Amino acid sequence: MDNMVFLLIKFYIFFVILFLLGRAFIIINSKIFKLNFHEESKLQGIDIQIFYPVLGIFFLGNFLYIFNYFLPLKNKLSYLILLFIFINFKHPIYYEKLKGILKTLPIYIILLATSYDINFHYDAGLYHLNNQLWLLESNIVAGFSNIYGPYGVSSIYEYLSAFLWLDRSFMLVHFLSLVFIGFFYTFL
């Protein structure tokens, strides 16, 4: 039971970081493009707060892709993206508007059960983990798919996964998938 409580705490810290990165992304874009952003904004009739974690993933992934042109992802400077979280404190967060996010908590608790005794899929060892390790150790390599064909068809998800190699369990990589699955279930 202690392990599940630890996973729950770890997931919600991860979720809050993605939420704040997504909100910072919206705030930055509203300043750059002079948009009228406010917490009551809706996207196709849906509260914009629901989209913050996915936008945070988008923002983080694109930052890591650009960063990897110059430096490997294991460089400590890659964590500077987390400074964007402080942009949230310049604009107040209306906690009563976060009720929609709080309604998704049971969905994520149920999804966290998939984290118990999880193992790698066979193609993780075939090329995903090797590709992610390469992204961590070096900046972008021209002709990367000439080394091994599947390396050339990787996506921004590989950059995100490589960045999340913070512990030996690779649980944060699994949490990334849970955010997408939970986002899908919020619309059902």
Task: Tell me what each language-model feature is.
Residues 73-81, 100-101, 123-127, 173-174:
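Short, aromatic-rich membrane-interface segments at the entry and exit
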Residues 112-188:
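Active-site lumenal/periplasmic loops and adjacent helix-entry segments of GT-C-fold
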Residues 100-115:
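Internal/C-terminal transmembrane anchor helices
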